[in-house]
Regions:
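Active-site-proximal, substrate-binding regions of enzyme catalytic domains
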Residues: 1-204, 215-277
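Conserved residues at the C-terminal ends of beta-strands
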Residues: 212
Length: 277
C-alpha cells in the first residue's frame, strides 16, 4: 500500500527527549556527581484522543519496516519540516523505516526562485504576523495557480522547453482544475498547502494520505460528499487509528516508553532492537 506521510506525522514520531538523570550520592575526593544522560517521554498531549493517534505511529512504523506499507514524502512536505525542531532519535516510531521521494504535482522552482528561507515558508497567518516576506511562499504560489485558466495553461505549455516541465508536470497542468476545486472546497487559503499535498498524492497514485489533523479528514469527507471533482485516482485521507483499522489492526502496539520514567542512555541499547535503530 502506497502511503504519503504528512509533515505532522514525522513531527510527532519522536517520543523522547534527552535529560540529565536524577542525582544520586556524590563520591570521590572532588565530591563528584553520578548523574547520567538518558531519556524521558515527552509531555503527553492534553487531548487524549489526539495522543492516542500519536501513539499509533509506533504501529505504523512497524508496518513500514515489515514492508506492508510503502511510505512516501516529497519536497513541499520537506520544506514544512524546516520549521520543526529536530528531536531525539531514541524511541523514534519511524526509526529504521524506509521512505521514498515522489515528485510534486508541480515543481515551484520551475516558476519562481530566490532566497531559500523565503522559498520554504508556508506564507500563512503566522508568517504575515511576523512581518515576513511571503512572495515566494507555498501559499502565494498556490494562490497564483488558482487564478490560471485554460488560456494561461496553454501559454505555459508553449514555454515547456524553457521551463523544463516533465511529462508528469504537463499532466498536472492539464489536471489543474482538480487542484483549484480542492482549494475552493477547503474554504481558506491556509488550507491550500494541504490541498496541494492531497493533489500531489492523487497524481502519484497514493492509496492513503496519512495525517494527524482532524480538520483535513473533515475537508476530505466534504470533498467526497460534494462529488463535483473529477479525480483521476482516489487517495483517501486518514488518521493513524482509522488507517490501522483499514489494515485490520484492531489494537495498536504498546508505546515502548512510559511517562514519568527515566531511561539511562546506556540501558537504552539493551532495549528491543527495533526501537531507536
Amino acid at each position: 500500500m502506497r502511503v504519503m506521510l504528512d509533515n505532522g506525522i514525522f513531527g510527532h514520531s519522536q517520543f523522547a527527549e534527552s535529560v540529565l538523570g536524577p542525582q544520586g550520592p556524590r563520591f570521590g575526593i572532588h565530591d563528584q556527581d553520578n548523574q547520567v544522560w538518558g531519556f524521558v517521554r515527552k509531555t503527553l498531549d492534553p487531548d487524549r484522543e489526539y495522543q492516542s493517534q500519536i501513539d499509533a505511529l509506533f504501529t505504523v512504523g512497524r508496518l513500514i519496516r515489515e514492508k506492508r506499507i510503502e511510505a512516501f514524502t516529497y519536497c513541499e512536505l520537506m520544506f514544512e519540516s524546516f520549521n520543526r525542531v529536530i528531536g531525539e532519535t531514541a524511541f523514534d516510531a519511524f526509526a529504521g523505516c524506509a521512505r521514498s521521494d515522489c515528485p510534486p504535482a508541480l515543481m515551484r522552482s520551475r516558476f519562481r526562485g530566490g532566497d531559500g528561507f523565503a522559498f520554504a515558508r508556508k506564507g500563512g497567518k503566522k508568517d504575515r504576523k511576523r512581518g515576513l516576506d511571503t512572495g515566494l511562499s507555498q501559499i502565494d504560489f498556490m494562490e497564483w495557480l488558482c487564478t490560471l485558466d485554460d488560456r494561461h495553461i496553454a501559454a505555459i505549455l508553449e514555454c515547456n522547453a524553457i521551463l523544463g516541465l516533465t511529462e508528469f508536470e504537463i499532466g498536472s497542468l492539464r489536471n489543474l482544475s482538480c487542484f483549484q476545486r480542492l482549494c475552493a472546497i477547503s474554504q481558506s487559503q491556509e488550507n491550500y498547502p494541504d490541498m496541494f499535498h492531497l493533489w500531489t498524492a492523487q497524481r502519484n497514485r497514493m492509496d492513503v494520505f496519512l495525517t494527524l489533523e482532524k480538520k483535513l479528514t473533515q475537508i476530505f469527507k466534504h470533498i467526497e460528499h460534494a462529488r463535483i471533482i473529477e479525480i483521476e485516482h482516489q487517495t483517501t485521507v486518514l488518521r493513524p487509528l482509522e488507517f490501522l483499522r483499514l489494515l485490520g489492526v484492531a489494537e495498536p502496539d504498546p508505546v515502548p516508553i512510559e511517562p514519568g520514567r527515566f531511561y539511562p542512555a546506556h540501558e537504552f541499547m539493551k532495549l528491543p532492537q527495533w526501537v531507536g535503530k
